[in-house]
Amino acid sequence: MKFNRYPIISSGAEHLVMGYLMRRNILTFKAPPNHQGYDLICIHPGAKENGAHLRIQVKSRLATDSPLAFPVRKESLDAFDYLVLVLLNVGNFYGRAKQNPAPRGACTPTIFTFPQSFVKRHFDGSSSWKKVCLHQLRLDRYRDDRGIERIARRLKIEYPTPASCVVGYRDFELQHTAPSAKPVRIRKPR
């Protein structure tokens, strides 16, 4: 079977994940190229507060009608903390391609964020194509922002709030102080 390789699109999946992570205030860096096991490194934006880091492996599927499965090397199962699957949904390439060819089958990308324990539990090493099958699994808690939130919680990153907003009492306002970025209540002048 012949496989198409699209390195720009694969790199785009990594950058898409970086964008989602940074949107949630998670400081994210690309790992060195061809680094086995993980593609991104995530740390707390206030590294002095929390020196923890997480290793993220990014897998992508190009076709909208691709099966919900992805290959993973057994040797790399311990090399990452989270695996992010990006369904790029570029268009139909398989069975539906005859009735609805690419790009007509294109739609918005979907992101799933799986912890290492989930990947290990659903890893199928018995087939020649070592993979994780997601068919018939309930995946809502790992999807899009809910999945990204798992990484933020693990790094103990609070949800971003406005720099100054009224919190219900007329005499207090919520302000962020640099560099800790933790909310502090300050009495408003009258």
Segments from the language model and where they lie:
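Mixed-charge (Asp/Glu-Lys/Arg
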Residues: 1-36, 41-190
